[in-house]
Amino acid sequence: MSSFPILHLLLLLLGCQVPQAQGRPFSTDLPKQYFTMINEIMEMLNKSPSPSEEPLDSNEKETLLEDTLLRPNLDVFLNASSKFHKNGLLIWNNLKEFLPLLPTPTPRGEPISIMENNWGDFQRKLKKYLEALDNFLNFKNKP
């Protein structure tokens, strides 16, 4: 008598005993809504008052483009956007949607700082941050 059918039955039973993965399923296909939200925020930032033409210094750029600081920087922008009543709530509503997409790695440095109630500083830095966020999401979206 062959043990082949018994082996199949044992494999089937073992397969049923494997614990299921917990958490959200990982999908490489991000909905287009996230890229649309980035564009909506950029449009709000480009409206009047016109954004400051003053360039960011190299340390600020590095801080905004650092992948390990994406989540801490998002927290800073969420907090700062609540201080700007006109567009702040709309920006905050869009930005908070990115929280579940960003990992919380050990940051390599301090998050960005934004001058208190300074719309121009907020605009300049958020535009560069959105560029980094878009790059991160595009990379994550590639198969």
Swiss-Prot record:
Monomer. One of its GO terms (molecular function) is cytokine activity. Granulocyte/macrophage colony-stimulating factors are cytokines that act in hematopoiesis by controlling the production, differentiation, and function of 2 related white cell populations of the blood, the granulocytes and the monocytes-macrophages. Keywords: Cytokine, Glycoprotein, Growth factor, Secreted, Signal. This is Interleukin-3. Glycans are attached at residue 79. One of its GO terms (cellular component) is extracellular space. GO terms for biological process: immune response; interleukin-3-mediated signaling pathway; positive regulation of cell population proliferation. Belongs to the IL-3 family. Its main location: secreted. Residues 1-23 form the signal peptide. InterPro entries: 4_helix_cytokine-like_core (IPR009079), IL-3 (IPR002183). It is found in: Secreted. It comes from Canis lupus familiaris. It comes from the Eukaryota. It holds the Pfam family IL3.
